[in-house]
Each structure stands twice: as C-alpha cells, then as structure tokens.
C-alpha cells in the first residue's frame, strides 16, 4: 500500500488537525505548503476519495420520479377508470387506458429525467469554484474537484469549499452560522495550536475553517483536510438523509394535531399540491378540482339512468370522467420549463430555481447595481487631484489593463473645481507628465514629494496585480476592477506593486521584474516595503487600508483608500498651502475637498479618496504596534489626506437600449449603487434611468427621483410608504438599504428583481421575488442566494431573462387554454349526449372512451408541446407585466376556455346529429356502447363523424390560441401579401405545424383500419360524413375567428372609454410621468440633496 493511501486512510479517522502545527498537518496529510499537490497526485486522490459533494445536489432519485408521475389527481382518474373497466370486464377499454397510463408515465419519466439533468447541468454552471495551488501555481477549479492535501486560497465573498487547516490568515473572519448556529462572524488565526489534552468544540477550533462557511472578511490560505461527507457540514448532511420533513413532530402540539398536519403534508405531497414550483402547485390543485368534477359528472351520468348501473352506464361514466382530464398537461409543462431553462443558457442566463422562470414574467420593478452590471466594469483612471500639486488627467486610453496606452497630462496647482470654473480657459496644461516628472521638468513651485506620497499610497493600498502575459503578449490583471484601474496607473508611472514590495509575479518573466526594479531605483518611491497587516474593504465602512514596514527608513506606514466620506472621516490633517507642512483639516478645507468630489462625480466618475500616516519604530512599543495592526479603528485614525482619483466605468453599449425596452414593457428600473450621488446621477442619465433633461424638472421632483442611502434609511416605513413614488436612484446605499427598498416595493404589491454580487447582498437577493447574481464578479455566497445567475454580468441579459420568462408564461397559458377548452368541449358534448337513448332506453354515448383518450393524449399532446415552443409574440415586451397573484388563469383565459369549448361542442354535436339524422336513418339501435351489431350502423358512423370533427377542431384550436386576440390570418400584419402571411403563420412553428398535420392525418387510419375501428374505437368507416366533419370544422374555425373579432372590438371599446389603460398610449408616455405629476412630496421628509 502506498504512503499516500496510508495517509488517506488515516485522514478519514483523524479529526484533531487543530492540535497540529501547519507543518505537522502538511506532513501528516502529505502535501507541500508552497507547491501544493501535483496534478497526478490530485487526480489519484480524487479517484480514491471521490468528488467533494454532499451527495444530494445532482443525484437523481428515480423512485421519487416514478411516484411523482403516478401520484397525481389526473393519473388517479385514469387508474380508477382502468379499474372500473376491468371490473365490468371491458377488456379493450381497460387495456387502452392501461396503455395510456403507461405511455403517460413513461413520457413523464423521460421528460422529468431530462429536465432534472438539465437543471443539474445548470447548477454545475453556477456552482462555486475553488482557488488552489497545484504544482506551485494558482489554479481555479470546480469545488467538487478539491481533494485532501490541496492548498486552498479563500477571500471575502468565497464559500469555503472544504474543511481547512489554516496556514495563513489576514484579518480573516467566517460566518459559521450554518454549522454552529452562531450569528456573529468568527475570527480565525492560523498560528493557534490547541493542546491535545483539551476537548475543543468545533466552533472553538479557530485555526480551522469549515466547508460551506462564508468568508465575510479578509483572506486566508489553508490545507484541505476533509471533503464531502467527511467534512463537518457533511456529517450533518449525512445525519439528515432520509428525513423528508413530511412528518410533524412539534412538541408544542398534541398527537392528534401532529397526525392531522402530517396527513395534510403527505396527502399534499402525494397529489403535488404542496411541492414543486408555484405553477406546478396551481396545476396540481387544478387537477384535484378536475378530479372532483369528473366524479360529479360520473354521478350525473349514473343519476340520469336512475342509478341503474350496468356495464354500459359504468363505461359511459368513465368516458365522461376521462373527458375532464388533460392528462398530457404535466408532461407538456415539464418539457416547456426545461426547454426554457436550456434556452436561457444561450442568452447568458443560468436558471438555478425553476420558480424564477415563472416569476420573471411578472417582474415590474428591477433594482440593479451600477458597477459591472449597467456599466462594463472595466474601469479607467481619468483624473487625479493631489492638493497643492495639481490635477492629472489621462486621455486616449480605452484598454483597462494596458499601462502603455493613453496620454498623461498635468494641470499644475489647479483643482478639478478650479479649472472647470476657470473663466480664462488657460490653465497651463503640461503634456507628457511622466517624462517631465522623471526628467524633473516641472515648475519649481510644485513639490514632487506630494505626488510620490500619493502614488505610493495608491500602489500599496491595493491588492490587484497587473502583468503582461508572456504567452499572449497581452496585458492582463487580477483583482477588483477599481483597484486594477489604480494599479494600471501606478504601473503606467513605473511604480507597480512588486517594485515596492519586491514580490515576484508568477505571470511575468524575471526580465520584466528586473527591468521595473532597475528603472525604479532612481525614481520616486524606491523604498522596499514589507507587508504587515491589512484591513480589507468592508461595505459598512467603505474603505480599506494596509500596514507596511519601510525597510529603508525603518518606518511603519498605513495607507488607506475608499469612499470620500469614509476616508475624510479618518483624516485630521492634510498638506498646507505650502505643500510641505502637515496642517490640521478645517471645516473649510473639507468643504473645498468636497467641491472637487462633486466636480469629478458630476462627470460620471467614481471618486475615491487616499490618505496615509507613518511613524518610526521608536514611536511605538510592541503592544502599541500589535494594537495598530489588529485594531482597525486605531490604524485608520488621524490620517493625512493625500488626494482623490476619478475613475470612469463606461456604461455597456446595450444598457441604454435595455432600459428603454424595460420602460416599454412597463418595468421600472432602479439603480442602487454605492457610488457618490453625482456619479450615480450622471450614469443614470446616460443610460436612461433618469431623464437626460433633468434640469427641466423642479428640485422637488429631482429629490424624489434621487436619494442617498442615508436619506432613504432615515425615513420610517410610514414615511417611505407616504412617498408618491420610490426613488429611481439611491446612491451611497448599503446592503440594508437594498433590503428596505425591496420591503417598500413589496408593501406596494410590486414584484421585483434584485441584482447583487457581494456577500452582503445575500439578504436582498433572498428577499426579492427574483434574485439575480453575477456569474463573473459575483461571490459564491451571492450565487447560492440567487434564483438566476448572469453568466456575462450584463444588465441587458436581465432583459433576455424577462423576455424568456414572459414567452414561457405566454406559451403555458396557450397550451393550458387549448387542453382545458378541449376538456370542456368533450365533457359538455358527452353530458348533452345523455339525451340520446337507444331502443332499450339506455344512453348512447356520442364518443367512446378510447376516442376521448385518443383526442386527449395523442391528438392534443404534440400540438400542446408545439405551443410550448412558440416564439415570442411581436408585442411581448410592449405589454405590462402579468399579475403574479392571478398567474396564468386570468379572466380572459377562463372565459376563452368556456367560449372555445362551447363552440367546439356545438360543432361536434352538429356533426353527430347531422350524420345520424341527415345522412343516416337516425336509428340509435341497441347495445351500441359495447360491441357492434347491425342496429348500431348509424351510431358508429355518426361517432366517426363526431370524432373527426372533435379531432380537427382541437387541432385548429392549437393554431387559434397562438395569439389570444389577433386573427389567425393576421398574425403577421407586417407581411406584404395575405397568402405569404397565412403560410408564415402556419410554418412559423414547424413543430406545431407537423404536429397538426400528424393529427389531421391520424384520423383516417383509426376510422378505416378493421378491428381497430369497430372493436377499439367503436366507430365505422364513413363516406359522405367526411363532408360534415370538414364543414363543421370550418364552422368552428369561423366561430373562433368571430369570437376573437368580438374580443378585439370589446377591448377597443374599453380602451376608448378608459384611455388611461391603453397600453399603446402608455408606451408613448414619458416613463418619468409618475414623478413629474407627483404633487405631494411631504415637507416633513427632508430628502434634499446638497450639491
């Protein structure tokens, strides 16, 4: 047995890694702290220990799938009908029903299997990744491929992929509430080692990090010690396996109450009324309703025979019951939803929860972040202001990673506010600033040390890396886009991060590194810095800082950057008028700085402030230094303000068009961003969230459109609810602000979607009706909390998702209408058919049970699938969102169901009676509901005519419901020829076309094939009766067209009398009309914005 195998076996038994040092842990598990595992070894271990999963994400439960197909009300009607058929010895009907049940269950199983596989593959697309070191190089792999011995890197926003023995931590906190129930984050320390004699609980093992915990602060490196079900969370998952949650064991309730609750849960799960997506539950409830209606109709049949129930009456009752069951409905729904989820992948939307497919069509408010969603997320440094030094501008730069691109200029001494308000226009711009700086060709009254201090801070208060990829000869970067923009500028000025710290980049050649260092020795910032501590960016404080030791002058330096308000609150001084001495910051000084922040933000730039402080080794003792490096408040106090940077994040090219289309679709778009209010307002105007002519609106209206997070959070719930409209832009917003916004929308009965990418966005993503996470820049935690993931982080992809959600909802509505209208037609037809009595006084059913089943299962199923694949209607995104409370069962759908059903009933009844009394002699014979005899000739031929008519009407109905109101012959009014328009209508959906053709043709063989026709279907070949079938099918088509014409006239009249409900008129209105017409902005709510 190999050494690795021994260690793996020991690893399964050993649980005291918290008692080992990092070196001991690495030796025990067989890995290198610096190199990690080799690729071959990692593959061998993966094969030995299996994938790192809890075993329940992608496993297909075949038993549950079978039960799901069998245990529903629709199948139960078929099963009962089958049992009765066999009980009365109608072997043919019973056999056909058995076959239908088997086919239905088989098709359902296949489609559910495919749908499950599709959803599992989509889950894999959005599953968390892990960052590991293998062969000495950092790699990103799927979390399921992590094995014991991997060296794993984690940072803020990551979900820890496996149990880790930490070997390096930097201000590292994790959320272990999922494991321990402790709501507060837990601080970790890799240097701790616990005694072997001590009993240390899982929650107290502070040198370990546990699988599925979220990183809420800092970063760390650790050895993977346990994976999958061997991890701490895996042990819990293993103990919970097999608990369905259907049995109530509430100790506060009595045995009888628990039994009642459990019975309801089990029955609901059995019938599908309390499991699955909301739409599945609604349809399961519909199935239960139809079951009881079927029972009622069967009772009516028996009552009409005075409950003298013989074989024929029982079969007729079965026939009527079957007519009420759209048995193919669940199958078609499953196919439609799985296809919809697959289609969304091609449109950069990954569906994680099927519920979201239904919810997307009802969304009427979208709350979106700005950075990387509305904008490209590829940030470019545009302006830098260093007090007493001047303003640096960067132009002609479009590549966010290439430091060699662009022109750098200096406006000496002028601040952005000053040069933008300079009436002379001559601000003395100095071109080629970099060359002038290093050639010392700058005005004598400009102190280069000011720029050096700012540049050192910008470089070191930064963890992004910029490098030239030797393989592709292209510039690339790793890190946050904002930090990348700053690091690119530092690299442009020949002062990259590794030039100050001496760190070697694994992505650059040594030649490049040496070049940077050798060039840097004679330029600003030549000191060598050692990283001591880091306080990472936090959405609460909105800043980050790093502590470095300068080996050249033996000083400790704290460098910070962040939002202006956050940084300025930490500063007590800045460089005075001479630019040399540090002087206290006064309120007047802060207001001067604030003016420049406004000036930059009003140009759509994201503004960050920079500050620093330093002290010598003699100024602090060890305890004071430890306090500084561990206490954020101490480290980030009494800083010296150094300057500002304005970063431009250009809007995506598709954003403005997407916002316009959302407005056309009746969807409001809100921007909730952490950026400064001026930046947010400028970008919002650029993309159309705010009107471009905002200056035409009164200040009161502007204040209702734009707020800051503190202003919105400062309002009570009552004050928020009293606002006539909710703000379109909230700047400087926190995660809690997003939660309050969603709560406010929900109180207004709005159906909203929320985008998010950070750990702290999880509450708002969960609370929103549709949570949307970012696939590229989103954290693992936000993805897990979301319903859908945008694989390209693009706002326009949300439009794709909404459009696909509406298309799918539309199509579900169409095939539900088609199937239920057929059921109504068949049920009414058979109930009316009770009036036909044979020579023995028994009812003669005008359609046989097998004919009913054929129309429901064979004729209707494939056209219904075709309707599920129907393309989006041309006006799909010109309609308002559908009512989420009503769902697909609107009053229009309900009325249409009965209208089409009644028209179809009339056509079929006319065909039956026309054949029976017109073409034939009108004799109803005797015993014609079971076997054929000579007296049944007229009845059997008339059934054939009615069967053909019902079949063809059902197929024509599928074409008619492609559009709920528009005439089938005017589906494409933009076509230049009626003939072309007709063929475009029938050929546009080829699956539907061939399904209908198949249905039309299938009527002939079942009428003419011997034995099948008279023994199974209980009808006979016909001749002249085909004319009746064709005539009354056309009559149905005309009736359907007249009904739709009446609908169009009705809605036109409604629009004329209620122009405010006219959708076309609404689309032409100003989307900001609700704001401009608001007349009551409460004066007690101070929402003014100072600028």
UniProtKB/Swiss-Prot annotation:
Residues involved in Mg(2+) binding: 369, 371, 757
Subcellular location: Cell membrane
Keyword Transmembrane assigned: yes
Membrane-side (Cytoplasmic) residue stretches: 1-63, 112-282, 334-815, 870-885, 965-991, 1043-1091
Annotated protein name in UniProt: Sodium/potassium exporting P-type ATPase 2
Organism: Saccharomyces cerevisiae (strain ATCC 204508 / S288c)
Entry comment on modification after translation: The active site is phosphorylated in presence of sodium or potassium and in conditions of higher pH. Not phosphorylated in presence of calcium ions.
EC number, UniProt record: 7.2.2.3
Cofactor(s) for this UniProt protein: Mg(2+)
Membrane topology category: Multi-pass membrane protein
Membrane spanning stretches: 64-84, 91-111, 283-303, 313-333, 816-836, 849-869, 886-906, 944-964, 992-1012, 1022-1042
Segments of skewed composition (Polar residues): 503-519
Keyword set, alphabetical order: ATP-binding, Cell membrane, Ion transport, Magnesium, Membrane, Metal-binding, Nucleotide-binding, Potassium, Potassium transport, Sodium, Sodium transport, Translocase, Transmembrane, Transmembrane helix, Transport
């Amino acid at each position: 047995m190999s050494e690795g195998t021994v260690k793996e076996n020991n690893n399964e038994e050993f649980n005291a890694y918290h008692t080992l040092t990092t070196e001991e842990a690495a030796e025990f598990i067989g890995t290198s702290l610096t190199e990690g595992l080799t690729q071959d070894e990692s593959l061998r271990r993966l094969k030995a220990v299996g994938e790192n999963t809890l075993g329940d994400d992608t496993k297909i439960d075949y038993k549950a799938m079978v039960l799901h197909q069998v245990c529903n009300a629709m199948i139960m009607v078929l099963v009962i009908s089958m049992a009765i058929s066999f009980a009365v010895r109608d072997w043919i009907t019973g056999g056909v029903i058995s076959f239908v049940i088997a086919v239905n269950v088989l098709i359902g199983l296949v489609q559910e299997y495919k749908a499950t596989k599709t959803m599992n593959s989509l889950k894999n697309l959005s599953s968390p990744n892990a960052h590991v070191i293998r062969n000495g190089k950092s790699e990103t792999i799927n979390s399921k491929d992590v094995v014991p011995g991997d060296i794993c890197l984690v940072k803020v926003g990551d979900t820890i992929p496996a149990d880790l023995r930490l070997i390096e931590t930097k201000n590292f906190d994790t959320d272990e509430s999922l494991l321990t129930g402790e709501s507060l984050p837990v601080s970790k320390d890799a240097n701790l080692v616990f005694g072997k004699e001590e009993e240390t609980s899982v929650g107290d093992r502070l040198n370990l990090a546990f699988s599925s915990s979220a990183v809420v602060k800092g970063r760390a490196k650790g050895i993977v010690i346990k994976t999958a079900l061997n991890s701490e969370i895996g042990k819990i998952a293993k103990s919970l396996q097999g608990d369905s949650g259907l049995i109530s064991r509430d100790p506060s309730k009595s045995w009888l109450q628990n039994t009642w609750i459990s019975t309801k849960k089990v029955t609901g799960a059995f019938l599908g009324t309390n499991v699955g997506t909301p739409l599945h539950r609604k349809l399961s409830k519909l199935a239960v309703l139809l079951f009881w209606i079927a029972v009622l109709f069967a009772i009516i049949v028996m009552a009409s025979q005075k409950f003298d129930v013989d074989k024929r009456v029982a079969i007729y009752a079965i026939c009527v019951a079957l007519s009420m069951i759209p048995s193919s409905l669940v199958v078609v729904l499953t196919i439609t939803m799985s296809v919809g989820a697959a289609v969304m992948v091609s449109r950069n939307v990954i569906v994680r929860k099927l519920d979201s497919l239904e919810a997307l069509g009802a969304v009427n408010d979208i709350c979106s972040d700005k950075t990387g969603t509305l904008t490209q997320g590829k940030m470019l440094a545009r302006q830098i202001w260093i007090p007493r030094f001047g303003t640096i501008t960067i132009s002609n730069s479009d590549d966010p990673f290439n430091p060699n691109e662009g022109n750098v200029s200096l406006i000496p001494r002028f601040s952005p506010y000053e040069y933008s308000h300079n009436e002379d226009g001559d601000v003395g711009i100095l071109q080629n600033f970099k060359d002038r700086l290093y050639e010392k060709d700058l005005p004598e009254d400009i102190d280069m040390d000011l720029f050096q201090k700012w540049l050192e801070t910008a470089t070191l208060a930064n963890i992004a890396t910029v490098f030239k990829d030797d393989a592709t000869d292209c510039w690339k970067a790793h890190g946050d886009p904002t930090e990348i923009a700053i690091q690119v500028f530092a690299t442009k000025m020949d002062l990259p991060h590794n030039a100050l710290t001496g760190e070697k980049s694994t992505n650059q050649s040594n030649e490049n590194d040496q070049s940077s260092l050798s060039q840097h020795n004679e330029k600003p910032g030549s000191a060598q810095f050692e990283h001591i501590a880091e306080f990472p960016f936090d959405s609460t404080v909105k800043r980050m800082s790093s502590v470095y030791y300068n080996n050249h002058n033996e000083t400790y330096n704290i460098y910070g950057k962040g939002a202006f308000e956050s940084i300025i609150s930490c500063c007590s001084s800045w460089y005075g008028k001479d630019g040399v001495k540090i002087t206290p910051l006064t309120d007047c000084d802060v207001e001067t700085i604030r003016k420049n922040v406004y000036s930059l933000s009003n140009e759509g730039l994201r503004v960050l402030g920079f500050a620093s402080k330093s002290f010598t080794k003699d100024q602090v003792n060890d305890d004071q230094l430890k306090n500084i490096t561990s206490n954020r408040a101490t480290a980030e106090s009494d800083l010296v303000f150094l300057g500002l940077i304005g970063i431009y994040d250009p809007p995506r090219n598709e954003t403005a068009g997407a916002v316009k289309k959302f407005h056309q679709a009746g969807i409001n778009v809100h921007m909730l961003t952490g950026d400064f209010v001026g930046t947010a307002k400028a970008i919002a105007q650029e993309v159309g969230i705010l009107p471009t002519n905002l200056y035409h609106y009164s200040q009161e209206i502007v204040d209702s459109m734009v707020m800051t997070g503190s202003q919105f959070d400062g309002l009570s719930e009552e004050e928020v609810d009293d606002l006539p409209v909710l703000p379109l832009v909230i700047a400087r917003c926190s995660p809690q602000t997003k939660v309050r916004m969603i709560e406010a929308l929900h109180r207004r009965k709005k159906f909203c979607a929320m985008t998010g990418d950070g750990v702290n966005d999880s509450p708002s993503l969960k609370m929103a009706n549709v949570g949307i996470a970012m696939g590229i820049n989103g954290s693992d935690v936000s993805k897990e909390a979301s319903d859908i993931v945008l694989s390209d982080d693009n706002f326009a992809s949300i439009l794709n998702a909404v459009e696909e959600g509406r298309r799918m909802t539309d199509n579900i509505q169409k095939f539900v209408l088609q199937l239920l209208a057929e059921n109504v037609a068949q049920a009414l037809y058979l109930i009316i058919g009770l009036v036909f009595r044979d020579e023995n006084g028994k009812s003669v059913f005008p359609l046989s049970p097998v004919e009913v089943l054929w129309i429901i299962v064979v004729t209707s199923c494939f056209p219904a699938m075709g309707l599920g694949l129907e393309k989006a209607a041309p006006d799909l995104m010109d309609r308002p969102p559908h009512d989420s409370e009503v769902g697909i069962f609107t009053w229009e759908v309900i009325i249409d169901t009965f209208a089409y059903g009644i028209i179809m009933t009339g056509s079929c009844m006319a065909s039956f009676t026309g054949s029976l009394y017109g073409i034939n002699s009108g004799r109803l014979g005797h015993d014609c509901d079971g076997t054929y005899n000579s007296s049944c000739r007229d009845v059997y031929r008339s059934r054939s005519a009615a069967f053909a008519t019902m079949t063809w009407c059902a197929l024509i109905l599928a074409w008619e419901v492609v559009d709920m109101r528009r005439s089938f012959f005017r589906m494409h009014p933009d076509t230049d020829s009626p003939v072309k328009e007709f063929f475009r209508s029938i050929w546009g959906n080829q699956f539907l076309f061939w399904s209908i053709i198949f249905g039309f043709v299938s009527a002939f063989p079942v009428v003419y094939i011997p034995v099948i026709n008279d023994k199974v279907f209980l009808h006979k070949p016909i001749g002249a009766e085909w004319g009746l079938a064709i005539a009354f099918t056309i009559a149905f088509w005309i009736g359907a067209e007249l009904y739709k014409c009446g609908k169009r006239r009705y809605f036109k009249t409604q629009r004329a009398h209620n122009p405010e409900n006219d959708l076309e008129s609404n689309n032409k209105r100003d989307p900001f009309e609700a704001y401009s017409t608001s007349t009551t902005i409460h004066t007690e709510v101070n929402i003014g914005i100072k600028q």
